[in-house]
């Protein structure tokens, strides 16, 4: 069984980006710049933002975190986004979700310049993904694809099952898996709460991707022997953090599996850095 180590892979990605940034920084005239907007004091969001700041520093990216009161108005938040859109030294804008009640997250995401939408959630970038055109890809599914590629695990010609249909993970991941390319070209089935005989669908998967937000939902009897299992879920339980997959028993059946934590979480942040550096290169012409 291969443990798909997202933490180590993400560290390698950061190191590669740092070398790239160091080599091009003089020509560009500045380092890449990422702006992170955090509204309110949600503890989990604060941890995520700190992790992103540390990762940026490792990769040679200058980050600015804008920590805004939960009492901010929609207009104030929109004005902040507009100001960051206008700044030449900012290559990427990330709006940390979820937003406090009363704020329209979709409207805010749509106000971010698509050329700075390094989270990949703007309708323009989602549309480009659907059409197979170049653009920023959502970070979590793109991180999943990078992890598969780094371990030379190609789903091409295989049956891939995606549990979950969210706009953040399930939908874009299904599109990426079914696209043309050496680490795509899968036959994809998307499952959700209304899927009949969900367990049987899972048992037929050569590649099983789980992103439903239910701790230890996928058990060993739902997994085809030798399948590759990617657990995107992270859930807080009384015993600590747990994924959507019952890791211990499933790891005895799968040929490769991601741990939680240390699997897809670090890869999500790594992809954010990849997108930011790509934006910087394009905007600076290097």
Curated annotation (Swiss-Prot):
Listed pathway(s): One-carbon metabolism; tetrahydrofolate interconversion
A Pfam family it matches: THF_DHG_CYH_C
Listed GO MF terms: methenyltetrahydrofolate cyclohydrolase activity; methylenetetrahydrofolate dehydrogenase (NADP+) activity
InterPro entries noted in UniProt: Aminoacid_DH-like_N_sf, NAD(P)-bd_dom_sf, THF_DH/CycHdrlase, THF_DH/CycHdrlase_cat_dom, THF_DH/CycHdrlase_CS, THF_DH/CycHdrlase_NAD-bd_dom
GO biological process assignments: L-histidine biosynthetic process; methionine biosynthetic process; purine nucleotide biosynthetic process; tetrahydrofolate interconversion
Gene Ontology CC terms: cytosol
Keywords annotated in UniProt: Amino-acid biosynthesis, Histidine biosynthesis, Hydrolase, Methionine biosynthesis, Multifunctional enzyme, NADP, One-carbon metabolism, Oxidoreductase, Purine biosynthesis
Gene3D superfamilies reported in the protein's UniProt record: Leucine Dehydrogenase, chain A, domain 1 (3.40.50.10860), NAD(P)-binding Rossmann-like Domain (3.40.50.720)
Enzyme Commission code: 1.5.1.5, 3.5.4.9
Domain of life per record: Bacteria
Reaction catalysed by this enzyme: (6R)-5,10-methylene-5,6,7,8-tetrahydrofolate + NADP(+) = (6R)-5,10-methenyltetrahydrofolate + NADPH; (6R)-5,10-methenyltetrahydrofolate + H2O = (6R)-10-formyltetrahydrofolate + H(+)
Residues binding NADP(+), per UniProt: 164-166, 193, 234
Assembly: Homodimer.
Similarity remark: Belongs to the tetrahydrofolate dehydrogenase/cyclohydrolase family.
Function: Catalyzes the oxidation of 5,10-methylenetetrahydrofolate to 5,10-methenyltetrahydrofolate and then the hydrolysis of 5,10-methenyltetrahydrofolate to 10-formyltetrahydrofolate.
Name assigned to this protein: Bifunctional protein FolD
